[in-house]
Amino acid sequence: DLFVRWRIEELFFSNWFNHKKYVHKSTLDSFFSQQHPWTYSLKGKKILVVHPFSETIESQYKNKKKKLFKNSEVLPEFASLQTIKAVQSIAGNPVGFDTWFDALDWMKSEIDKKDFDIALLGCGAYALPLAAHIKRMGKKAVHMGGVLQFLFGITCKRYEENDEFKPYINEYFVYPDAKDRPKNAFAVEGGCYW
């Protein structure tokens, strides 16, 4: 296990984590600005992405992966890319499941059907339980959160207003496709993902 440290409040729990390996969140999130990013370790691997923007991610990887970043190590050639469209139980939208746990179980069952080496997760509150499920399968998972969309050249309000990200956005970046955008999307965190 590798823990990502982010907040000062983690000091209160440090005695529980002192035997674990950890990195700071900036190491995980700033892959696009590093000379040798951690994402290069995905080269040649079978990658599964669980994210609400599955269709946009597939399109960007298939059509523009070599144009998104000047550093080709940021988004390397995978052996394969598969996606699962994460359930978005947000903004009052119906999701087709009676409970949050039913949606989680459905995503677990979809993951069980896939052949992959590493899963990249950007699926909100579902990510940690899914990562635990993937670990129990004997596979690896990386919970990237919101920055996962940036790896595939998908921009949004959050990145266009952030001076750290702005220099890396080029003409090949896109907004999430309409098929990947829920109704009332802009009611969620001020529309920062869209």
What spans do the regions from the language model cover?
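Electropositive, gly/pro-rich neighborhoods at or near active sites that engage anionic ligands
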Residues: D1-E77
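Glycine-rich phosphate-binding "P-loop"
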Residues: W16-H24, Q82-W106
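A general structural motif
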Residues: G44, D115-F116
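Hydrophobic/aromatic beta-strand patches that form the interior of the parallel beta-sheet core
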Residues: L48, Q82-I84, L120, V142
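Gly/Ser/Thr-rich loops at beta-strand to alpha-helix junctions
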Residues: P52-T56, L120-P129, G145-Q149
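A short, acidic, amphipathic alpha-helical segment used as a generic capping/interface helix at domain edges
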Residues: D102-D115, Y126-L128
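C-terminal functional extensions of proteins
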Residues: P129-W194
